[in-house]
Amino acid sequence: MPDSPDHVLDLPPTQVRLMPERAVFEPASGTLFVADVHLGKAAVFRARGIPVPHGTSGETLDRLAAAVARCGATRLVVLGDFLHAKESQSASTMAALAAWRDAHPDLACGVVEGNHDRHAGQVQEAFGFRTLDGPWVSDTLRGVHDPAEASVPGRWTLAGHVHPVVRLRGRHDSLRVPCFWLRGRVLTLPAFGAFTGGFEPSLGDADQVYVVGDRVSPLPRQTPR
């Protein structure tokens, strides 16, 4: 795909596309993976008296709709932290989620339970999202929330939880950007949500990161990090 903004990554016996929408798509199964959506996080902050912008959940759902449409996914798997907290269940957030689901009635949706989901409750089930209390498993991939749960010899695993970012350094300044982080057979996705922080993991010599911008690009290993 020479003109595609995606980066094609071989994970034998399958192949996935790392998308600048901060998602992973497996064409063979039609499955789109995202992690750490954190819907309603801004509403939680406002409920606790912290002034933050409105509209971040709507922006996140718009990007999710665009990702589904661009790749033609038939299944969506959220790798944990779909909602941020119980206070995320504001009327505006729930209305936005209901409208999003109404626009995608044929999309099979599942959520691998993350640490925030356990506190937020399983409200997503009312919108047709199946909650999984263990890893999501197919013939080719495993999906978990925390990379620490990922050790299964010989299996490729997709994970979230970390919100990986990488620092790109210029001569006079630097910039932190979201990235996909591959260590061994574990691919950790960047946080999908519009209102999320990031963590710079300590990268090993064999690790590979894929920088997210207008397109997804591998960061040369010899580049100082």
Q: Each predicted region: which residue ranges?
A:
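Extended recognition/assembly regions associated with phosphoester-bond processing machinery
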Residues: M1-L79, H84-R225
